[in-house]
């Protein structure tokens, strides 16, 4: 798509219902992100989500996706320990989760694992910049690559990942000037997440872009505000149940009059007996 100048659209989502919507909307890639941890499962950060949880949700998304590429996000410690772990767990995403590719966070520190996964025949999407799995190492959720030295390091990591065989690269929370430079220097497409307008594609979390989350980062644009109306719908349901307004006969099933009469007669006969 990069060669044709066509922008890539990627959305992160985690269940069959929303994945079906996203797929039908014409999105190119569905990422089952490790943000499943805090968006859906209620964890404080992405470090807590397990392989089994990721596979479970990837299965649901894959069953919904008819046209979009499904990418499974390798969770924390599913690939860092060894190349063998990396290959095994990446393989689970394809074999069990029915994804077509995996995403791996990190640069030179995970290069051998990325190479091993690629050489095993599994497509890999890279991820540089703000990498949440490395948040403690980098001192928190901050924009990366703001100095010339830090930017050069990210650019070099990007080139190394391309040589290692990744088919695309997510750039998260980096200055737009750096993202533009990386995009220009690489032959593979870049997908921005808070990386400005010059990447080859963009990604947002479904729940952020439709307004289901309470707060969002600066780089998120809300295309709807569904959280409020959804909450109100539940409140209206609660109120109508409490006051007896729901359900009405309109929402009820009916027995034919003859059967009602027969039932009443049977009950009378039973009482006499």
Label for each model-derived stretch:
Residues 1-224, 228-257, 261-273:
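Alpha/beta enzyme core
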